């Protein structure tokens, strides 16, 4: 089985870490995967990649294309010979226009649509939609007291890791700051911006900080929450995406409203927990490790490829 992953290559890393890790998890269990990064933004930027794209799929015989995010999915659908599976991650469907496009034009043309939480599946309401969150590399994100990277955390302060960089509006840093300001009157806190760290450093951070704080306005199935769970890190988060489902029943993890006082109160409760959680056990029980998710993805591929082959035979 040979799969072509199609995705935007415009970020600083050229590929989102969770897409890279999904590819690696498929490679680890014997699937042949190639990457196609779309370079350029906007309609003209995407269209400028079409010649290279058609050359790629002409030179190699692919059984299936797996595209991530709506614009890459639309791009992959410019060809009609190879079946396409598309993964929507949530952020790509927040605008009314993209949601309308996905529901009425994109998903009907896909062989299968993957979404990362139940809310998305209910809203899209299509028999082609399945729920399949991205998995976590539990061999990298593992409870570990020994630091392998030089993080230079201030051990005299309570260290709280914010879920993203402060500039992204959907991450709602202002709410986090308001809550921290309320607590600073009584506790010496250090709020760490999740920016510029490599994957090993993120794992070390989640093992060394006192808790992870997420105050997002919206999410799909946030990887950082699952990575924190894999490291047994206490968590405080707003009720976005599938976070409530993920954290349900995990002591030391708390869901908060968008009220700064409530966020501050939940932070205090998480700090008073004074220990590590059993988030890793919950994560694994949900089957959200990379290997387990990779096996589910392969079943999706096999179903699509088999159905496509049958249609070709019956169409003769």
Task: Name each model-derived stretch.
Residues 272-310:
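A charged, aromatic-enriched C-terminal amphipathic alpha-helix characteristic of glycosyltransferases
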Residues 234-237:
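Short hydrophobic beta-strand element within catalytic cores of glycosyltransferases
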Residues 217:
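Aromatic "clamp/platform" in nucleotide-sugar-dependent glycosyltransferases that forms part
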